[in-house]
Amino acid sequence: MIALIQRVSEASVTVDGQVTGTIGKGLLVLLGVEKEDDESKTKRLRDKVLGYRIFEDDAGKMNLNVQQAGGSVLVVSQFTLAADTKSGMRPSFSVGAAPADAERLYDYFVECCKDKDIQTETGIFAADMKVALLNDGPVTFWLQV
């Protein structure tokens, strides 16, 4: 399971002209699900995403996680993160989870975030989405479990 996380000042996702999720300060989480992923990996990635200390403390050091910084999370499904790009000029998605499995684990990731009492907004799984964000930094990390 892969999360590309970006520290943002604000972010939103729109589907068919309707905003489905919006946050202020926090993390935009682009989530990719692979074939071998399960609930255990989902919880481990949730813990890593929410615990990752990429927000500045009073001394200006990256020392706070999203909850300590008073932020929110916007989770957007992105199957292209599970692409194999090692050869050729066209990505292969053979390592990506089947759509039904990916949706189930995406939903589980969202619920796991909400269980930690953090404001969690979402896009719509497998929809054509427009994602708007204002990067803070920019600060972007690739997390994989």
From Swiss-Prot:
Belongs to the DTD family. Pfam families: Tyr_Deacylase (PF02580). It is found in: Cytoplasm. Keywords: Cytoplasm, Hydrolase, RNA-binding, tRNA-binding. A Gly-cisPro motif from one monomer fits into the active site of the other monomer to allow specific chiral rejection of L-amino acids. A motif (Gly-cisPro motif, important for rejection of L-amino acids) lies at residues 137-138. The keyword Phosphoprotein does not apply. An aminoacyl-tRNA editing enzyme that deacylates mischarged D-aminoacyl-tRNAs. Also deacylates mischarged glycyl-tRNA(Ala), protecting cells against glycine mischarging by AlaRS. Acts via tRNA-based rather than protein-based catalysis; rejects L-amino acids rather than detecting D-amino acids in the active site. By recycling D-aminoacyl-tRNA to D-amino acids and free tRNA molecules, this enzyme counteracts the toxicity associated with the formation of D-aminoacyl-tRNA entities in vivo and helps enforce protein L-homochirality. This is D-aminoacyl-tRNA deacylase. One of its GO terms (cellular component) is cytoplasm. GO terms for molecular function: D-tyrosyl-tRNA(Tyr) deacylase activity; Gly-tRNA(Ala) deacylase activity; Ser(Gly)-tRNA(Ala) hydrolase activity; tRNA binding. It catalyses: glycyl-tRNA(Ala) + H2O = tRNA(Ala) + glycine + H(+); a D-aminoacyl-tRNA + H2O = a tRNA + a D-alpha-amino acid + H(+). Homodimer. The lineage of its organism: Bacteria, Pseudomonadati, Pseudomonadota, Gammaproteobacteria, Vibrionales. It comes from Photobacterium profundum (strain SS9). Transmembrane segments: none annotated. Its EC number is 3.1.1.96. Its main location: cytoplasm.
